[in-house]
Amino acid sequence: MAASLIRQTKLLSVFSSAGCFRSIHSTAACLKNRAARIRVGKGDRPLTYEQAHHPHHISHRKGWLSQHTGNLHAEGGAAERVLEDVFIRRFIFGTFHSCLADELVIKRRGNVLIICAVMIQKLLPSKFYFLLGYTEELLSHFYKCPVKMELQLVDEKVVYKYL
């Protein structure tokens, strides 16, 4: 028994010195890195205020787009808040199709969910009021808490600068 173990260890040492082991690599083969910012162009691309500032300027020049207490110490539910935010953003983007002028700001104050948006006035005011009530009522039913939407209407998309 001991002789067979010695033979196996000698065999393994021969293979390990020859470099015959295979390993699994979990990194991407192309190794491309992309910065989280808008690329510089010819100066003909309009940018909003949120797009013009880089991500490291959050809390200095621009604010967070989602305000909640899920990331505080000993507070749970941060992952659930992110999923809720993604659902709310997609739902409102689909409901008010081609009317959003800028990103949504989602605030949670106690049990109330407040959604702030800047929209382009492409629809009649009566249709905006209907979609506003529809969105508030449906999201209140989904999340079992009061939902309030604060809208600001503009004539056209507000351009901060061109890049």
Swiss-Prot record:
One term under GO cellular component: mitochondrial small ribosomal subunit
Main subcellular location of this protein, as a coarse class: mitochondrion
Transit peptide: 1-31
Keywords associated with the record: Mitochondrion, Ribonucleoprotein, Ribosomal protein, Transit peptide
GO BP annotations, alphabetical order: mitochondrial translation
Subcellular location(s) per record: Mitochondrion
InterPro entries from the UniProt entry: Ribosomal_uS3m (IPR026146)
Pfam families registered for this protein in UniProt: MRP-S24
Annotated GO MF terms: structural constituent of ribosome
Similarity section: Belongs to the universal ribosomal protein uS3 family.
Quaternary assembly: Component of the mitochondrial ribosome small subunit (28S) which comprises a 12S rRNA and about 30 distinct proteins.
Identification of the protein by name: Small ribosomal subunit protein uS3m
Source species: Danio rerio
